[in-house]
A protein has these predicted regions:
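Flexible "arm" and connector segments at domain edges
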Residues: 1-76, 82-210, 214-273
């Protein structure tokens, strides 16, 4: 590497004792790892190969937040930052863009989307801020209609989150149920259609109707003002805790769950519930 100052040289040569590091240091470390005489694994990575890593690191951040483990949160945020820097380094090598482009683009976006802070626009509350944000985003992306906005919601999002985003945008365009009762009625309607599909027995039809039921349940969550993704996560965690409790009681009795009858397991389930 050329044009390195003394600190850069120490970082690039792995001399880490008692150093305070900066963002530039991290960028230089990744460049060193991806150099010809760097790390074979790091050199092999591409935008494509790192996709799963980015997803996993993001979920580990969420896990730390959910656990209120802020020491671990610091570490996990660093891992997410590492992913950003890795992608920027790969792009830099391919002359696609640089980390400066990433940072500069985000700075411009934040300034442009906060005219009430960096301009003269006056706002009443946070809801107005969100409305302005969406309007500015529409102009930036050159969306001509709501359909353009919906079509650009990432397909890689978790299904519950994507469904909710689609429903919210459709609601802003006027495609919305008028009441909770209407939404609940739609859930029951989709459930009946699923029952009919099951009677027919065609797997693709069952899957389609099950998807419709799930979509309507996400819609119901909006009217209940609860987060569908969080609700399902909490329900899953509750089931896991109860299962662990049931198995613990079974072991105390010197038994394995697979050796027990359904009624015996149900009795233990009632104890932990």
């Amino acid at each position: 590497m050329e044009n390195l100052n003394t600190k850069d040289e120490k970082v690039m040569n792995g001399k880490f004792e008692d150093e305070k590091y900066s963002f530039d240091d991290l960028m230089n470390i990744i460049r060193r790892l991806r150099a010809k005489d760097g790390c074979p694994w790091d050199r092999e990575q591409t935008h494509e190969s790192l996709k799963q890593c980015l997803i996993e690191e993001a979920y580990e951040v969420i896990e730390a937040i959910n656990n209120q483990d802020y020491r671990n949160l610091c570490e996990e945020l660093g891992d997410v930052l590492l992913q950003v820097v890795m992608h920027a380094a790969i792009a830099e090598e391919g002359k696609e863009f640089t980390i400066e482009d990433v940072i500069g683009g985000e700075c411009k976006k934040m300034i442009n989307r906060h005219p009430h802070v960096f301009g003269n626009l006056e706002v009443k509350d946070s809801q107005t801020v969100l409305s302005n944000w969406e309007e500015i985003k529409q102009k930036e992306k050159k969306y001509e209609n709501i359909s353009d906005s919906i079509l650009n919601i990432p397909k890689a999002l978790p299904a519950n989150i994507r469904a909710e985003k689609v429903q919210k945008k459709a609601a802003k365009a006027g495609l919305e149920f008028e009441s909770y009762d209407q939404v609940l009625g739609k859930v029951y309607e989709e459930l009946e259609e699923l029952k009919e599909a099951r009677k027919i027995g065609q797997k693709s039809y069952v899957e389609e109707e099950f998807g419709d039921l799930m979509f309507s349940i996400v819609n119901l969550s909006r009217f209940l003002h609860v987060n569908a993704e969080n609700s399902l996560t909490n329900a899953t965690n509750k089931f896991i805790n109860r299962f662990v409790g049931v198995e613990s009681f079974a072991r105390q009795e010197g038994k394995h769950l697979w050796e027990m009858s359904a009624s015996e397991i149900d009795t233990l389930w009632g104890r932990v519930k």
